[in-house]
Amino acid sequence: MKGSFLISSNSSEIDRNIFANKSSLILQWLLVIGIEKEQFSIREVAKECNLSLGLAQRVFKMLTLKGYVHVEGLRTSKKFRLKKPEALLKTWLDNYNIVEKCKMWTYRSAFQNKEQIFQTLIKNNLEKKVILALHSAAEAYGYKNTNLNTIELYILQSDLRLKIEEKLLLEPQEKGYDILLIEPYYKSILNSFSQSCKLSTKINLLCSPILLTYLDLHNFPLRGKEQAEFMAERIEKLKKIYKKTR
């Protein structure tokens, strides 16, 4: 069984810029952790993001040139601080659109409710191989602002899609969806920063990190921006940036 392929990126190559997959770990760190620090070093960021020092240096060079971070000192004694978090976030939003960057498949399901679907994932040992995304992640964090009853899932391994289709009794759907499967662009962020969300006493699933959920929703056509703004006005991690970005 094959799902309905929604849209794909126009290029198979990873963009070689600060918004690429691995580089995004640094942006995530800056906007969530670095924003709380008076100063930090490139070596510190590279270590915490598990990236090579060379990649971190290239990303910081670009961030400095664009004025997002401020640098003090020389050579190995350089220290940085995040100078323009709101501008960095806005530029990231301008350069990332989940619909353009990710492959998506839309389905209807024979199951009657979300709990049955989540329990089926757990029963088939798939709960650590999918990640709640978009509106599903917003709901899991307790910040749902729509009446949508859809499920959006990142799939960490593309070869698992057919198994998920089979176990969840999925049928392709051309317009709208009950379930949306997504092959992620920002795999590095998901692997490093996804959080465990307790949906009920028996259901515990991984959720897309709050910042990535916001980025994903902002340009998502199905009531995404509305949901993103609702979250940004209420979640402290986002409020620090968003209040200056609107």
Label the predicted regions:
Residues 1-2, 97-246:
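Long, low-complexity, charge-rich intrinsically disordered regions
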Residues 3-28:
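Short alpha-helical segments that sit at the start of domains
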Residues 30-34:
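Short helix-to-turn junction characteristic of helix-turn-helix DNA-binding domains
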Residues 36-49:
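Short acidic, hydrophobic short linear motifs in intrinsically disordered regions
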Residues 62:
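Alpha-helical DNA-recognition elements
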Residues 66-68:
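Glycine-centered, phosphate/nucleic-acid-interacting loop/turn motifs that mediate DNA/RNA or nucleotide
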Residues 72-95:
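Short, Lys/Arg-rich nucleic-acid/phosphate-binding segment
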